[in-house]
């Protein structure tokens, strides 16, 4: 990258333990790999903060012109991010963490995180079984949304992608959330009542991250796919306007 053109953004999601991961099927960057990457970036690039990026949007000469600039961001308000924030603090790096407000206000997980943990903990077959129960409970046609999965025959990753597409493209906004919360409450939370803090960050950690100098950003309310979701005015305000006000207050 030509350093005079601006900056590159690196977006992280899961940062997982090196050993004894309680959720080994959650895919992500290992803690040691993450720290090695941060060390390498620190040595070879100019790592900017979110405020630096905002300054650049107003003044194109606001960034270092001698090195390539990198902004590090994190999506989804995951529990892993508190560890990441402490590693960044060790290297005097400030980042921005985008958090769905349902995690903090409602104390409920974001939509895709329910899918990740549900499949990682119980397998795709079990997840699809509870999905059918949820569809039936909400008077929705099982045949319209059902996915047939034969472990000995089908590619599991392709079937997982199909499963994700149900919630992203086929179910409407309200039904998608209702079905996912049914799966969370009747499968994931039922198995472990303390699972939410293992999935997502909590308010005291967010406060401490702000004290470290990190920035918190909105990531809609329930982590919807904005481009793929038709929203009423009320739902638009909830997903798009409320999160910004929540963090500002």
Report the location of each language-model feature.
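Generic enzyme active-site microenvironment
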Residues: 73-74, 217
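Metal-dependent polysaccharide deacetylase catalytic core of the NodB/CE4 family, i.e.
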Residues: 10, 15-16, 67, 91-249
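Membrane-proximal basic amphipathic "stem/tether" segments
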Residues: 1-8
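C-terminal domain-boundary segment and adjacent tail
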Residues: 26-64, 92, 201, 207-211, ...
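Membrane-embedded segments
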Residues: 73, 79-87
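Acidic/histidine-rich helix-loop elements
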Residues: 16-29, 228
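Short, glycine/acidic-enriched loop or turn micro-motifs at the edges of active sites
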Residues: 78-79, 222
